[in-house]
């Protein structure tokens, strides 16, 4: 599969109108949600997560659950550890969604389905035997021979598009974190700078520990006893699991810490 986060690149060109319609977070979640099956302990079959029917049976329910977790547990916590200039610029866009509103859930469902469709279309042209590959026979032909291993056009397209997509996403993230909107007063924050740094470190350390734990929980022969590509895939999945679990667990802890802060509680009750 292309790197899961690379799929977000398909959403980037439409980020402004999506943000205007409050669809951005749901569409980003949707663009990655078919791959969430790889993060589950029981690993559902690909047809259960990457098919037209899976849009309704897997992508939509899992995407809506992820949307709730993001809005309720992750969004505000992550906002509070951002640098001041990024926090000031993104805060108007980071208002919690009205999770009691039917309209909000309809919009979230549309965003998730739209994002998931971009994922399935991308995969259709980058996986051997997929529908898009069957439509373009050249993608099913060998194009490169590496150490006696023939690399098909679809696989080459998968690797190249994954790297390009990942680069696009990283550039957008770095640009968003570094861009300065001009001189402005430093915002009043619920967390002091040193405490923000501690929480950022907590995210990183927790993700690393959990990724290592998920990796060692598998039999060594299942991780290292196959090809290099298979080994990299297992490491990538363990890393994704660790990052996802850390994002949820640490954000829950930070949310509890923030709710105990009178300033944060008063500020959020007024917005």
Predicted features along the sequence, with ranges:
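N-terminal membrane-targeting hydrophobic helices
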Residues: 1-271
